[in-house]
Amino acid sequence: MEDDQELERKISGLKTSMAEGERKTALEMVQAAGTDRQCVTFVLHEEDHTLGNCLRYIIMKNPEVEFCGYTTTHPSESKINLRIQTRGALPAVEPFQKGLNELLNVCQHVLVKFEASIKDYKAKKASKKEPTF
């Protein structure tokens, strides 16, 4: 129970700036009345298919996850609803957090490889005295 309260504190601390200067939470946790912690919808504001599909793919690789899907509410709104349902007693928050961390690791790995490739490319061009892009 304390983990849920800690997560709520963290979630409420995530803010995104709005056009009129007002602040709005970047992440909401929606749970229908009478449901358990294993089935939760996360509303991510200011996000789209880029994050939604990547996160869905990574979360579904977890064998404890029974269902993970996302929808965009409307093309003119930049928010997604990510629904996670787990097997057993695992709260849906855990695969969500793990998925975000794994996605961050993948992105960092891609960035490191990309920057190394650019550095190698420029070094080869410099040694041949060819102009780079």
Swiss-Prot record:
N-acetylmethionine PTM sites in chain numbering: 1
Biological processes, Gene Ontology terms: DNA-templated transcription
Keyword Transcription attributed: yes
Disulfide bonds: none
Cellular component terms (Gene Ontology): nucleoplasm; RNA polymerase I complex; RNA polymerase III complex
Record's keyword terms, sorted: Acetylation, DNA-directed RNA polymerase, Nucleus, Transcription
Entry GO MF terms: DNA binding; DNA-directed RNA polymerase activity; protein dimerization activity
InterPro entries for this protein: RBP11-like, RBP11-like_dimer, RNA_pol_Rpb11_13-16kDa_CS, RNAP_AC19, Rpo11-like
Compartments where found: Nucleus; Nucleus, Nucleolus
Pfam families, alphabetized: RNA_pol_L_2
Family classification: Belongs to the archaeal Rpo11/eukaryotic RPB11/RPC19 RNA polymerase subunit family.
Functional summary from the UniProt entry: DNA-dependent RNA polymerase catalyzes the transcription of DNA into RNA using the four ribonucleoside triphosphates as substrates. Common core component of RNA polymerases I and III which synthesize ribosomal RNA precursors and small RNAs, such as 5S rRNA and tRNAs, respectively.
Subunit structure: Component of the RNA polymerase I and RNA polymerase III complexes consisting of at least 13 and 17 subunits, respectively. Pol I complex consists of a ten-subunit catalytic core composed of POLR1A/RPA1, POLR1B/RPA2, POLR1C/RPAC1, POLR1D/RPAC2, POLR1H/RPA12, POLR2E/RPABC1, POLR2F/RPABC2, POLR2H/RPABC3, POLR2K/RPABC4 and POLR2L/RPABC5; a mobile stalk subunit POLR1F/RPA43 protruding from the core and additional subunits homologous to general transcription factors POLR1E/RPA49 and POLR1G/RPA34.
UniProt-listed HAMAP family: RNApol_arch_Rpo11 (MF_00261)
Protein name: DNA-directed RNA polymerases I and III subunit RPAC2
Organism from which the protein derives: Mus musculus (Mouse)
